Amino acid sequence: MGVQAGLFGMLGFLGVALGGSPALRWYRTSCHLTKAVPGNPLGYLSFLAKDAQGLALIHARWDAHRRLQSCSWEDEPELTAAYGALCAHETAWGSFIHTPGPELQRALATLQSQWEACRALEESPAGARKKRAAGQSGVPGGGHQREKRGWTMPGTLWCGVGDSAGNSSELGVFQGPDLCCREHDRCPQNISPLQYNYGIRNYRFHTISHCDCDTRFQQCLQNQHDSISDIVGVAFFNVLEIPCFVLEEQEACVAWYWWGGCRMYGTVPLARLQPRTFYNASWSSRATSPTPSSRSPAPPKPRQKQHLRKGPPHQKGSKRPSKANTTALQDPMVSPRLDVAPTGLQGPQGGLKPQGARWVCRSFRRHLDQCEHQIGPREIEFQLLNSAQEPLFHCNCTRRLARFLRLHSPPEVTNMLWELLGTTCFKLAPPLDCVEGKNCSRDPRAIRVSARHLRRLQQRRHQLQDKGTDERQPWPSEPLRGPMSFYNQCLQLTQAARRPDRQQKSWSQ
């Protein structure tokens, strides 16, 4: 499991040769990504190089005294293609330098001339960790395939498919992003590719993790302030658009009868997917103006739909950075968790906000209108006649709704819907013993029962009425009883609450 598994999920099981050529002779470079370090405007450099053998991805790092510290060469086609796709992606296009200026050209020439010495340093005892991870022999310049399957981002041991670390404490040359990847791989709440967990199946080719883990991963990468971390972050969050999930405690069946009925109920954590968060790379700030009048980001809104967005509007129209400017501005702040339940349903004047009203009404649709087992008014289902004018629901559905109402405290305007529920629901029981040859049904039969959770709802409604907290709630001009769904009835009530000038009627009347 690795944070870049989705980006190269189609790689299959392949080995990657680390080490590279003893001599470096390229005739064209592209997609240059630079990052400054204290004392050196060119501390990190990543780019694509074209030589007689083909295309390769090269990483290099210098210290504050402009001494070359590490370098790596990767010519795996899938990896170079992924880096090229990131370079061409609309959210990162303006962050790459496509035509190097004089300063960058001098750095490229220096790197080319010092390549053999850099590779020798990588093979020295100081680079033993990387050597062990690559599974290389002691022969200098001899590249052998790693013992473990998959590939890793050059200079790391954990950022890739699987890992190539000898033990859990090992880190690669780029220790900062490698540490972030290692901690993200250890997220305790995750769903592996094509696996089922927390009530959902992951049909993707990459692991999805809890939103808390993704948030910590994003913060960790941004705190590194280097180009390698930003490549990992932009690819994982922006290009792949990998979602995350939050866990919600819900009541569900934990033991079943052989005939399909529920034998025991319990509270279990169920996953709810959240749209991916956008990674604000430190290099992207070069495309923005540092003036004080820059736009401030809008506060995050509660997520209501599980859809993926292509990127925030402020990324559109970003200008290509100056070739001479290699210093990144201050990193943007990481957005907080987005798995916050909608709050503040009441408006400033006590009215219901439209967004909160829709959120409340959707709970009635999810738990009642879409209830799998229900008996319509004056209909017979599961060998039971519902003589009432309102639908009769399975106790599982009403129990989940009651728990939702108890936890989220919806506005009093929806209390009328509780009255329509009544205090009874039904459970499914196995069929009665049927004598062979008799014409009797072998289907489950419904048994109407008095539900304690519904009685508590009614008690709460009466308490609110006695306190007078709902006397100002409007009553729609048309009666709610009829074939209208609970969702539509809820919308009708909340719309009336937002228009106090309409005809109103107190519950106490």
Swiss-Prot record:
Residues 1-19 form the signal peptide. Residues 284-296 have a biased composition (Low complexity). The active site is at residues 184, 214. Its cofactor is Ca(2+). Its EC number is 3.1.1.4. N-glycosylation does not affect the catalytic activity, but is required for proper secretion. A nonglycosylated form is observed in several cell types. PANTHER family: RH14732P (PTHR12253). This is Group 3 secretory phospholipase A2. It comes from Homo sapiens. The gene is PLA2G3.
